[in-house]
């Protein structure tokens, strides 16, 4: 089976008229079948790419268990589900890793919005059961809300990878969550209406593979129902799609001109340059928002750190006073 891949190493213009081709097929899609864009976000090493492979049903995204991210650009593959909808899975690099520059992140967010032509039908936050919740992950939800607005949580699904760990320990996800669940995670699950799925991306059991993907698709369908069938879009996404439509329209007009091929090529080059310039401007806008969000997160972290230090100092002072009082009482007893 072949698959439809699109990577964005530069500003590429998606074709609105291009048919779905080379799709990883369970059955042939018809032109009327809808596309559901599912974007995977999360920390490097949490298993985003492996989860994408599980959804698609074969290894299409490069995936390795290592600290350094394998995915360096947004990539997308499509699969046709047995029930009809085409699932367009968008794998992202570690957009919320602290070591990644704001410039890189902003460009990849714009690339992600380019790939999600119809809008976002689900945002999958990938967390690993094998690691503690990191500061990056705690910042991720705030960053998503700052970049896209509070409505983004209406499209959020949490996927927990390393499901085999639960099986090895004879635990359920509920057991895991009830055993000292971090406040951040409680908040995320509350905001997204408890939409969560456990993925075992290493399993060879075809039944388990199918079941976990089906559970995810049930959540995607529930989001569609709850949002009235409207995918998530924001001002930035609409501007990107309007720009794409403009370029396609002008490209068609150039093709219809009765001029030499060399002139057509020159006009198309100018059009491509204007598109790239506009995409760069949008990336700069996104970078500014991201930097402001990162600065706000850092201020909050520093405030929490200061509060903890004050609490520690206060506790130390209280303990010291208690020890001094105890010593005084002891001395009084000795005198008596």
Curated annotation (Swiss-Prot):
Keyword vocabulary terms for this entry: Coiled coil, GTP-binding, Nucleotide-binding
CDD domains: AIG1
GO molecular function, one term: GTP binding
Sequence segments annotated as region (G5): 200-202
Region (G4): 161-164
Entry's Gene Ontology BP terms: cellular response to heat; endoplasmic reticulum unfolded protein response
Protein induction: Up-regulated by brassinolides. Down-regulated by 2-aminoethoxyvinylglycine (AVG), high CO(2), isoxaben, and propiconazole treatments.
Region (G3): 91-94
Residues covered by region (G1): 42-49
Pfam families the record matches: AIG1
Region of interest called G2, as start-end residue ranges on this chain: 69-73
S-S bonds: none
Keyword hit for Nucleotide-binding: yes
Highest taxon of source: Eukaryota
Annotated transmembrane regions: none
Boundaries of every AIG1-type G domain copy: 33-241
Stretches assigned to coiled coil: 237-270
Entries under SUPFAM superfamilies matching the protein: P-loop containing nucleoside triphosphate hydrolases
Membership in a protein family: Belongs to the TRAFAC class TrmE-Era-EngA-EngB-Septin-like GTPase superfamily. AIG1/Toc34/Toc159-like paraseptin GTPase family. IAN subfamily.
Name of the protein in its database record: Immune-associated nucleotide-binding protein 6
Source organism (scientific name): Arabidopsis thaliana
């Amino acid at each position: 089976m072949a698959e439809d891949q699109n990577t964005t190493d530069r500003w590429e213009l998606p074709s609105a008229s291009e048919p779905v081709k080379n799709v990883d097929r369970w059955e042939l899609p018809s032109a009327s079948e809808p596309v559901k864009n599912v974007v995977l976000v999360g920390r490097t090493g949490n298993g985003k790419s492996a989860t994408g492979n599980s959804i698609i049903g074969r290894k299409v995204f490069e995936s390795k268990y290592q600290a350094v991210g394998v995915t360096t650009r947004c990539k997308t593959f499509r699969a046709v589900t047995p029930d009809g909808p085409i699932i367009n899975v968008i794998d992202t690099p570690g957009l919320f890793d602290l070591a990644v520059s704001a410039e890189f992140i902003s460009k990849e967010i714009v690339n992600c919005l380019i790939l999600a032509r119809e809008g976002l039908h689900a945002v999958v936050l990938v967390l690993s059961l094998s690691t503690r919740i990191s500061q990056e992950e705690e910042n991720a939800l705030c960053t998503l809300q700052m970049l896209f607005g509070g409505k983004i949580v209406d499209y959020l699904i949490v996927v927990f990878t390393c499901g085999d760990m639960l099986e090895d320990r004879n635990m359920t996800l509920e057991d895991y969550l009830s055993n000292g669940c971090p406040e951040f995670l409680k908040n995320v699950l509350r905001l997204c209406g408890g939409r969560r799925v456990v993925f075992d991306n290493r399993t060879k059991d075809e039944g388990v593979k199918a079941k976990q993907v089906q559970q995810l698709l049930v959540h995607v369908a529930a989001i569609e129902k709850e949002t009235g069938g409207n995918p998530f879009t924001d001002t930035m996404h609409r501007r990107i799609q309007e720009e794409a439509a403009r370029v396609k329209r002008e490209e068609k007009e150039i093709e219809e001109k009765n001029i030499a091929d060399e002139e057509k090529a020159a006009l198309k080059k100018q059009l491509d340059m204007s598109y790239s310039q506009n995409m760069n401007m949008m990336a700069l806008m996104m970078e500014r928002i991201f930097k402001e969000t990162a600065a706000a997160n850092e201020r909050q972290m520093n405030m929490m750190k200061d509060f903890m230090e004050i609490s520690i100092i206060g506790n130390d002072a209280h303990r010291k006073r208690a020890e001094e009082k105890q010593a005084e009482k002891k001395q009084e007893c000795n005198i008596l």
